[in-house]
Amino acid sequence: MENIKRAQEEFKELIESEYARIDKMKQAEEATDFSKKEKIIVGILPGDGIGPIIMEQAVRVVKELVKDEIEAGKIELREIEGMTIENRVAKMESLPSDVFEEIKKCDVLVKGPMVTPRAGDGLPNLVSANSLLRRGLELFAAVRPIKIKDKGIDWTFFRENIEGEYILGTVSYTHLTLPTNSR
């Protein structure tokens, strides 16, 4: 019975935190109209592994595409440091709070790949930085439009990012095995 009570308490805390998150979203301000902003800050988060290599080329392309806006001061590209696996391991934080504060100052974020430690790779067990970013920034869905005109395909796929199978996030839960299940 004690395991059931503990599981109920943990599940209650989880549900209460989700309701608090939903209430916070309801109180959030309206979506930003970027056409009315004096300056748009684009955060550049290289990540690690091949991330910095990919991002170097992505930034090169972005700089060319919005060259006039950058020169006019309408767009600022701001590199955000501190999300390498080495830094995250040194701080023992998947998403260091100082880095997250810098990310939240940006209007747009261009993010490279980030390593998520796995069993056996010699790194400490850290939660996925990607999932923490999604949850922290309330990125509730990944939208993938697919159009192939000559085949008549015009589809849009929505992939849940922070609810559904992701609802538990970094919260652990109690797994109960009853004697009848272990025979």
What label would you give each PLM region?
Residues 2-14:
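Charged, compositionally biased N-terminal leader segments and the immediate start
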Residues 174-180:
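Conserved small/polar residues in nucleotide/adenosyl-binding loops
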